[in-house]
Swiss-Prot record:
GO CC terms: cytoplasm
Organism: Mycolicibacterium vanbaalenii (strain DSM 7251 / JCM 13017 / BCRC 16820 / KCTC 9966 / NRRL B-24157 / PYR-1)
Protein name stated in the entry: Trans-aconitate 2-methyltransferase
Function in brief: Catalyzes the S-adenosylmethionine monomethyl esterification of trans-aconitate.
Gene3D superfamilies assigned: S-adenosyl-L-methionine-dependent methyltransferases, Vaccinia Virus protein VP39
């Protein structure tokens, strides 16, 4: 279960890639803008302010996130990204930090490029950090007792779950798009006693939390804290630097 409040604890940090992505979308007066994986809707609102004459719609598979987005006045729909089909007047498709959770997203991108009208835009960014120390720590603790039984069938994601910019550029160019693709590694400055754990609790650890009892979850937290502290040490000034690689693609259908 995705918790909108936990996710929004780092809203400023999580929002920066969205703005970097949006800055490269050249749509002028779109009719319909769809935010796939809209989450709590705080960034979907930004789309409405940029394109006030467009019909802006959110789409998310989490009932909690959809409820939070609707609470902000967003036209949010509940559904899996894999099931989404663009309506004929869709001009802009945004997927911010969502497609890495969709195994077949490469096929979806090609399909959308074929369904959207010429001139339409597909813009997405995906987390490219599944080989980062934070994810290695998540998997290492999951292999320990007493967590192995509950987490034995976890769908762990490897580094190749997302492609390099050049892969997406080739994929969407072959699908008939003009493509701008790049990657950025952000160094987030975090504060607090367990800032990286607090960050991943809102994203990468959501499925782990679902599978563990309250007691087991607290034991898991205590087990992963020293691993994260070693990988992301707190500086003498109380700051922790958390590196996070992201891959960006902006494609216009031709």
């Amino acid at each position: 279960m995705w918790d909108p409040d936990v996710y929004l604890n780092f809203a400023d940090h999580r929002g920066r890639p969205f703005f970097d992505l949006l800055a490269r979308v050249g749509a002028d007066r779109p009719h319909r803008v769809v935010d796939l994986g809209c989450g709590p809707g705080n960034l979907t609102e930004v789309l409405g302010r940029r394109w006030p004459d467009a019909q802006v719609q959110g789409w998310d598979s989490s009932p909690e996130m959809v409820a939070a987005a609707r609470g902000r006045g967003v036209d949010a729909r509940l559904g899996d990204i894999a099931d989404w089909v663009p309506e004929p007047d869709t001009d802009v498709v945004i997927a911010n930090a969502a497609l890495q959770w969709v195994p077949e997203h490469r096929d979806l991108l090609v399909r959308w490029a074929g369904q959207l009208e010429p001139g339409s835009w597909i813009a997405f960014q995906v987390a490219g950090n599944f080989d980062a120390p934070s994810h290695a720590a998540i998997r290492e603790v999951a292999r320990r007792e007493p967590f192995t039984a509950a987490l034995a069938d976890m769908p762990w994601r490897d580094a190749d779950v997302v492609g390099a910019p050049v892969e997406y550029a080739g994929l969407l160019t072959d699908a008939g798009c003009t493509v701008d693709a790049w990657e950025t590694t952000y160094v987030h400055e975090l504060v607090g006693e367990t800032p990286v754990l607090d960050w991943i609790t809102g994203t990468a650890l959501t499925q782990v939390r679902q599978r563990l009892s309250d007691d087991a979850w607290e034991r898991y937290r205590q087990a992963i804290i020293p691993l994260l502290a070693q990988a992301y040490p707190v500086r003498s000034d109380g700051r922790t630097f958390f590196s996070f690689r992201r891959v960006f693609v902006v494609a216009q259908v031709t």
